[in-house]
């Protein structure tokens, strides 16, 4: 069912190719990256997005720097490498997968150097680690969906029918190496006959639900209906939502998690209406160094996103050009609102 979905990123002939998601759903085009800065720009500008996918891309950014941009003087390598890794990890601060993947690549490089293998071998180690990061991401996402099936089956059996699921933003194949996190749950549930349809929040201000999730589900043949974010309460009040599943960009030790702005009010609505609310994420999204959501740094984005609507031709101004804007990219959902966290190791209760 997923054969029509494009690869979010892949490595070929010494270059990283990133699906430019800014151009979806109108055009599927790839960016060819041979420099770390090109990857960083793609992450910052949302050409590639989603916590696991930007982790994958970040690992390749480290490898590209080692392969193509390292200083000619090998004695200057370590200091320059450490500085560049810090810059790559800081491109989007809320999603922990980016800093996690960069740290893993950095460790592989430093291990090769410590073993006396030299800078070229260390660069090769970075590339191997980037490949492994992508492969692990795909395997983890597939497992998330497989291990969610007992929970979906129990909910469907309780209701006596397949489930109507609501999701927010894009925690899909487009946000990962493949399968997605929340959509892996949806795809596996749909194939098993446990899901009837999906309600897709448009997800203002950048419209990841409207532009990406709706398109992705349609490509996969999963019935879906697009709704504005402020329609969720009416849907639940009418008894049209049986469960909610979203992704996550960072999960704290206590289960609080950051996800796309608008997730928190959706969780509050779900609790009020007795609708079970889940997040889905790989272990790489957990940041157990943070005690709670109060410790999460929230990225603030360009006011243009709120003043405008994103169209096929770019951003079109719809509000006064000088109106003051508050534009956090994420909000934090308290763990008390969660029915569970779907992971590649099974469901976690918090």
Question: Where in this protein do the model-derived segments appear?
Answer:
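Generic structural signal for well-ordered, non-membrane alpha-helical segments
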Residues: 32, 36-39, 51, 55, ...
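Conserved phosphate/anionic-ligand binding catalytic regions in large, soluble enzymes, centered on
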Residues: 45-61, 92, 97-98, 170-179, ...
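Histidine-anchored nucleotide/phosphate-binding helix
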Residues: 180-191, 267
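Long amphipathic alpha-helical segments
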Residues: 7-116
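Short, hydrophobic/aliphatic alpha-helical segments
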Residues: 31-47, 163-167, 310-322
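Short beta-strand segments
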Residues: 19, 57, 101, 166-170, ...
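Conserved phosphate- and dinucleotide-binding cores of soluble alpha/beta proteins
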Residues: 194-195, 201-350
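Ligand-binding beta-strand-loop-alpha-helix segment within the catalytic cores
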Residues: 99-163, 194-196, 200-244
């Amino acid at each position: 069912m997923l054969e029509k979905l494009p690869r979010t990123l892949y490595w070929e002939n010494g270059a990283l190719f990133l699906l430019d998601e800014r151009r979806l759903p109108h055009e599927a085009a790839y960016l060819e990256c041979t420099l770390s800065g090109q990857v960083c720009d793609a992450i910052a500008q949302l050409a590639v997005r989603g916590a696991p996918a930007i982790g994958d891309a970040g690992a390749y950014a480290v490898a590209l720097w080692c392969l193509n941009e390292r200083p000619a003087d090998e004695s200057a390598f370590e200091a320059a490498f450490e500085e560049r890794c810090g810059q790559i990890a800081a491109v989007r601060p809320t999603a922990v997968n980016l800093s996690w993947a960069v740290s893993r690549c950095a460790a592989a490089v430093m291990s090769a150097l410590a073993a006396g293998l030299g800078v070229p071998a260390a660069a090769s180690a970075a590339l191997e680690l980037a490949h492994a990061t992508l492969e692990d991401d795909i395997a983890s996402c597939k497992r998330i969906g497989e291990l969610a099936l007992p929970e979906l089956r129990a909910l469907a059996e309780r209701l006596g029918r397949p489930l109507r699921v609501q999701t927010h933003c894009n925690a899909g194949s487009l946000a990962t190496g493949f399968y997605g996190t929340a959509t892996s749950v949806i795809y596996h549930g749909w194939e098993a006959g446990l899901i009837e349809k999906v309600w897709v929040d448009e997800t203002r201000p950048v419209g990841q639900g409207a532009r990406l999730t709706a398109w992705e589900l349609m490509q996969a043949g999963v019935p879906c209906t697009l709704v504005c974010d402020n329609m969720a309460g009416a849907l639940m009040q009418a008894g049209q939502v049986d469960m909610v599943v979203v992704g996550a960009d960072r999960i704290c030790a206590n289960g609080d998690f950051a996800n796309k702005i608008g997730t928190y009010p959706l969780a509050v609505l779900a609790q009020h209406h007795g609708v079970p609310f889940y997040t889905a994420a790989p272990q790489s999204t957990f940041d157990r160094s943070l005690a709670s959501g109060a410790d999460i740094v929230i990225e603030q984005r360009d006011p243009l996103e709120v003043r405008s609507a994103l169209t096929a031709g770019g951003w079109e101004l719809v509000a006064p050009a000088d109106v003051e804007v508050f534009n956090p990219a994420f909000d934090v959902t308290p763990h008390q609102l969660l029915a569970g966290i779907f992971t590649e190791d099974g469901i976690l209760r918090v």
